[in-house]
Curated annotation (Swiss-Prot):
Gene Ontology molecular function: any one: flavin adenine dinucleotide binding
Alphabetized NCBIfam families for the sequence: mnmG_gidA
Species: Acetivibrio thermocellus (strain ATCC 27405 / DSM 1237 / JCM 9322 / NBRC 103400 / NCIMB 10682 / NRRL B-4536 / VPI 7372) (Clostridium thermocellum)
Primary gene name: mnmG
Gene3D superfamilies reported for this sequence: FAD/NAD(P)-binding domain (3.50.50.60), GidA associated domain, C-terminal subdomain (1.10.150.570), tRNA uridine 5-carboxymethylaminomethyl modification enzyme MnmG/GidA (1.10.10.1800)
Residues where FAD binds: G14, A15, G16, H17, A18, G19
PANTHER family assigned to the protein according to its UniProt record, in alphabetical order: GLUCOSE INHIBITED DIVISION PROTEIN A, PROTEIN MTO1 HOMOLOG, MITOCHONDRIAL
Subcellular location: Cytoplasm
Protein name: tRNA uridine 5-carboxymethylaminomethyl modification enzyme MnmG
Length: 630
């Protein structure tokens, strides 16, 4: 029997990484919010790898934090190992990655949700989106649970992860299920289809979890964390804690032989899996087939937490049967006597075609319905959380009658992510990578606060105290850059001895300290030896000063490119344009433009199938329209 159980401004369906950020953002912006989870013990669950961050993903976490989100703070509280990846490369691709204690992460995030003002946390399966339809225009009015409870709401955010019609595949066995042995959400997909929303079918997978006591670590390479810990959250200046090690081992020809001989029994190759899997996180059988010339593949053995013997085998995701999993794992050095605690499996699930969304993450054809995370065809906790905070902010802004927050490609990786999926769509689980960002030298993880904290403050998620500290940091950076550029270094014996020691050419006449800093073999901290008036500054400030001066030429060039990009982004396109009526546009361009309804000429130019010639026609049309109006 149906009954009215409550009324809210925002209802968030799902409490994974997208749902948590969405619910917290909306509630913190002062709107009455409820978040639903199929099981409250699965809030902020990590059904796959027990880590936060990584290449490009670390950028997303720092951007979420700079806007006022929770993921970075929670990772800082619960990590057990921290590392900067790509440190041998340039600063554009430095990426922070932390191994976290999976259960501690969940407990901390659950507690954060439970204590949040304006937020109720409820265990229930949502089976239907309730909506009104007037003259073909749909508007959400709430959600219904499996027990018939109706919750009225002005906005609904779907953050359903991999639960929609979830199907687990292990070899030739398949059954209806969600991740980690939880129930799937089988009815909500039908509700979305009835609303006319286009769904797709994707697949992802996870490796086995094995017992630490059955591993011989002496046959593996130890992978310790970094000595100096860089926090995810800009609110944390320094963290000191004991870290645990991960371990590296490799597959071999025997492992690959067993996999090849059993390919017909894999869900992926045996035909049981219909969904499209992630290109950049392939299963081990996929890797063995696609990279047949490779003699070995890396396997990282990672702890799931401090109070468990479970270890995660990164690189060994598979849908092979249980008996084959045991056989192949026992060919790997250090895993000869391994005991599997949880089998590897593949999971298939429904998601929406994200080209149905506006850049605000609201569906174009359903007023008040937002989506975030894996339901939008993305993969990864960080990608989900990034969409979650934007959906939560924009849900609250919609209720307050404010314009949505839209970050563009020159402002944030979050902007690149959302623009990519909304404008281009995706035919496989989308993963964030540094190569997707055209302006990656400007979108570094170290300057996420300089880029986005003023926006977070303006939106209302950054406190006065935090913003005051941020402005002080910005002042110190600007002041020190100016000092370094003005400081003269004379060609003294001490200076030239220092330069020789660091394999740098001695100077014959006075130079600015900034000129020495631009030399590739010298860095800001090293130069302290000959920089007598240097102030005592935090690592975060020193890093900004160093990068800003060392890469100044490249940064200026990229800023000029951004100016060109902005010109097309500022040419807005009305929603009511009928592209069929614009003479000169090719048929494919008309069809794509009418379907996606881009918000600017810049966005239109990135749609697959819209050529530079089509953009020229569009610009001429806009000029004609402008003249007619004036």
């Amino acid at each position: 029997m149906e009954f009215l159980a409550g009324e809210y401004d925002v209802a968030v369906v799902g409490a994974g990484h997208a749902g948590c950020e969405a619910a917290l953002a909306a509630a913190r912006l002062g709107v009455k919010t409820v978040v639903f989870a199929i099981n409250l013990d699965s809030i902020a669950n990590m059904p796959c790898n027990p880590n936060i961050g990584g290449t490009a993903k670390g950028h997303l976490v720092r951007e979420i934090d700079a806007l006022g989100g929770e993921m970075g703070k929670n990772a800082d509280k619960t990590f057990i190992q921290s590392k900067i990846l790509n440190s041998a490369k340039g600063p554009a691709v430095y990426s922070l990655r932390a191994q976290v204690d999976r259960r501690s992460y969940q407990i901390e995030m659950k507690n954060t949700l439970e204590k949040q003002e304006n937020l109720d946390v409820k265990q229930a399966e949502i089976v239907e989106i309730l909506y009104d339809e007037v003259e073909g225009k749909k508007t959400v009015r709430g959600v219904k649970t499996h027990t018939g409870a109706i919750y009225k709401s002005k906005v609904v955010i779907l953050a359903t992860g991999t639960y929609l019609k979830g199907k687990i595949i292990i070899g030739d066995v398949s059954y209806s299920g969600g991740p980690d042995g939880l129930f799937p959400a089988n009815k909500l997909s039908d509700s979305l289809r009835e609303m006319g929303i286009e769904l797709m079918r994707f697949k992802t997978g996870t490796p086995a979890r094995v017992n630490r006591r059955s591993i011989d670590f002496s046959k593996m390479e130890e992978q310790p964390g970094d000595e100096r810990i860089v926090p995810f959250s800009f609110e944390n200046e320094e963290i000191k804690k004991e870290q645990v090690s991960c371990y590296l081992t490799y597959t071999n020809s025997e492992t690959h032989r067993i996999i090849r001989e059993n390919l017909h029994r894999s869900g992926l190759f045996g035909g049981l899996i219909e969904g499209i899997g992630p290109r950049y996180c392939p299963s081990i059988e996929d890797k063995v087939v696609r990279f047949s010339d490779k003699e070995s593949h890396q396997v990282f053995v990672e702890p799931m937490g401090l109070n468990t013997q479970e270890m995660y085998l990164q690189g060994m995701s598979t849908s092979l049967p249980e008996d084959v999993q045991i056989e192949m794992l026992r060919t790997i050095p250090g895993l000869e006597n391994v005991s599997i605690m949880r089998n590897a499996y593949a999971i298939e699930y429904d998601c929406i075609n994200p080209t149905q969304l506006k850049l605000s993450l609201e569906l174009r054809d359903v007023e008040g319905l937002f989506t975030a995370g894996q339901i939008n065809g993305t993969s990864g906790y960080e990608e989900a959380a990034a969409q979650g905070i934007i959906a939560g902010i924009n849900a609250a802004r919609k209720i307050k009658g404010l314009e949505p927050l839209i970050l563009d490609r020159s402002q944030a990786y979050i902007g690149v992510l959302i623009d990519d999926i909304v404008t281009k769509g995706t035919n496989e689980p989308y993963r964030m990578m540094t190569s997707r960002a055209e302006y990656r030298l400007l979108l570094r993880q170290d300057n996420a606060d300089l880029r986005l904290t003023p926006i977070g403050y303006e939106v209302g998620l950054i406190s006065e105290e935090r913003y005051r500290k941020f402005e002080e940091k910005r002042r110190l950076i600007e002041q020190e850059i100016e000092r370094v550029k003005k400081t003269n270094i004379a060609p003294t014996e001490k200076v030239n001895e220092f330069l020789k020691k660091h394999n740098s050419t001695p100077i014959k006449s006075g130079v600015k300290l900034a000129d020495l800093l631009r030399r590739p073999e010298l860095d800001y901290d090293t130069l302290a030896e000959i920089d007598e008036n240097r102030p005592d500054l935090s690592f975060a400030v020193r890093e900004q000063v160093s990068i800003s001066i060392k890469y100044e030429g490249y940064i200026k060039r990229q800023m000029q490119q951004v100016e060109q990009f902005k010109k097309l982004e500022e040419r807005k396109l009305d929603k009511d344009i009928n592209y069929d009526e614009i003479k000169g546009l090719r048929l494919e361009a008309r069809q794509k433009l009418n379907k996606i309804k881009p918000e600017s000429v810049g966005q239109a130019s990135r749609i697959s199938g819209v050529s530079p010639a089509d953009i020229s026609v569009l610009l001429v049309y806009l000029e004609q329209r402008k003249r007619q109006k004036s």
